[in-house]
Amino acid sequence: MARFVDRVVLHLEAGDGGNGCASVHREKFKPLGGPDGGNGGHGGDIILTVSPQAHTLLDLHYRPHLKAQRGANGAGDHRNGARGQDLVLEVPAGTVVMSESGETLADLTSPGMTFIAAKGGFGGLGNAALASAARKAPGFALKGEPGEQHDVILELKSMADIGLVGFPSAGKSSLISVMSAAKPKIGDYPFTTLQPNLGVVDMGNDAFTIADVPGLIPGASQGKGLGLDFLRHIERTAVLAHVVDAATLEPGRDPISDIEALEEELAAYQSALDEDTSLGDLRERARIVILNKADIPDALELAEFLKEDIEEKFGWPVFIISAVARKGLDPLKYAMLDLVQQSRKKRPKQKVEERIVVRPQAVDARKKNKDFEILADPQVENGYLVVGEKPERWIIQTDFENDEAVGYLADRLARMGVEDALWKKGARAGCTVTIGEVSFEWEPTTAAGVEVQMSGRGTDMRLERNTRVSAQERKRASQVRRGLIDEYDFGDDQKVTRESANRDRWQG
């Protein structure tokens, strides 16, 4: 029998984004081809999807370290890098995704549901995408961003309509084996069942699912026995069925005391639950009592004697059956189906979320420094920390071995208002400023309060106005040298004489 795993810890690492490419178009007779570096591809995501073929988390248990594919780097000729392939993990219905701190991130309850557990990094821009009127031929590109890296906890909670609860060896596995096609392990010793078993009870025009939860003992809600690991499998059940051993011979135990002990554990477990399953409080869900093993001598007499007392004390329907002899099963099945149908009618329908409409709003220039925050560095004297999503992303994207890329970063930070904010905080030239994982000595490029001007880094002078001497101008200069004319006006108040023509003879 395959091992049942209902809790795993995954170490996820999404794909990194590919780096952008810095290249210039090279073609015969096209000296001014311009930048043509492509963008890097985005990194692959790690996606969890609910599959009806998955019934356990066993596959993920043996490979907890998962990494998605990296995005390809950009290339010349405007070729963008390929996107990294997503890593899709199939999980069974009822899987809950939690963070390391225990916060619920997603509840995957139905086939087809997906959740992006780790987002891939964005690819870096190539120099073709960075070109502008002020920076016509950038000699740099942006690096790709790293993908998300974190741990998540997956817990599987059975999606059953009815949950069978009871003390060990009460006959729960025997009951589910005769009511459905499930084939659980059956034995005459406690804790034979070490994993939940699910079965489908076919009632002709309808059907319902039933779960066999391993035996509970007093103190299960505090972790005694196997209870704490398996109590979560009854959180989603609409009906709880107490399976009671009517033939128990243990001193101090009887069907009523067994039911009371189990109810105390369920109440204690409910107080620790903070999840809304849309099924209501665990203590208020429908219940039935099943007095099993009525085929054993004296057990049937005891069950009939206690039936009225149980109904009067708890107010729940009581059924006397024998799973081994297959007696009393039909009335029990129809009663279970009736309770399940009532529960389905009462269950609130999920509300359709309102469509989110994004409406652009004007940005107040006076609030341009709201994208970051300047803090004093507690570890460095006269040091400052620049905290914000955008500045930290820009630091990751920058190739610090390229002076032009560093200049581009300085322009971006200046336009955002970082330099002005540092000056107002008291920072002066030479102070240590840390952004992300990079620390540097701050040298302000603009005075505080002055409008930032584009520096024009990366401008290709060949793309400016052509100042080369034309053929006609060379011809006239030759005439000057031969004495045919005294001078020639080149324009822009420049005069060519015999001496200057000889000096610039080979110009152009």
UniProtKB/Swiss-Prot annotation:
Binding site for GTP: 166-173, 191-195, 212-215, 292-295, 322-324
Keywords in alphabetical order: Cytoplasm, GTP-binding, Hydrolase, Magnesium, Metal-binding, Nucleotide-binding
Subunit structure: Monomer.
Gene behind the chain: obg
Lineage, uppermost ranks: Bacteria, Bacillati, Actinomycetota, Actinomycetes, Mycobacteriales
Protein name: GTPase Obg
Cofactor dependency: Mg(2+)
Source species: Corynebacterium diphtheriae (strain ATCC 700971 / NCTC 13129 / Biotype gravis)
NCBIfam families in the record: Obg_CgtA, Obg_CgtA_exten, PRK12296.1, PRK12297.1, PRK12299.1
Ranges of residues in domain OCT: 364-444
Family assignment from sequence similarity: Belongs to the TRAFAC class OBG-HflX-like GTPase superfamily. OBG GTPase family.
Domain of life: Bacteria
Keyword Metal-binding in record: yes
